[in-house]
């Protein structure tokens, strides 16, 4: 694997339905400029995860979109609602023209 790996443990308790299979912290990967290892429960929102990675890399979260298998994720959705499972790789990329509300 390329780049630094940083473990991060999400501790948010947001509302809404969650995938119960992720209630025990599991590892997910986030690729931005570097590859980061995140410990997630599935209750973290996409916006919270994006903001955390942006702070690690000095990025502006509002200028970024989180992708799962090439599809943009909604900021207010939890990772569990988006189908993030153990060992899932998310990508944080620059926002493209025409991509709104994510």
UniProtKB/Swiss-Prot annotation:
Disulfide bonds: none annotated. SUPFAM superfamilies: Ubiquitin-like. Residues 23-99 form the Ubiquitin-like domain. It comes from the Eukaryota. This is Putative ubiquitin-like protein FUBI-like protein ENSP00000310146.
């Amino acid at each position: 694997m390329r780049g630094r790996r940083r473990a991060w443990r999400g501790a948010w308790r947001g509302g809404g339905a969650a995938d119960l299979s992720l209630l025990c912290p599991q590892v997910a990967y986030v690729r931005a400029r570097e590859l980061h290892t995140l410990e997630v429960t599935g209750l973290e929102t996409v916006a919270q995860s994006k903001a955390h990675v942006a702070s690690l890399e000095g990025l502006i979260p509002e200028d970024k979109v989180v992708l799962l298998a090439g599809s943009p994720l909604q900021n207010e959705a939890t990772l569990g609602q988006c189908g993030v499972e153990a060992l899932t790789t998310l990508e944080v990329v620059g926002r493209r023209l025409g991509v709104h509300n994510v």
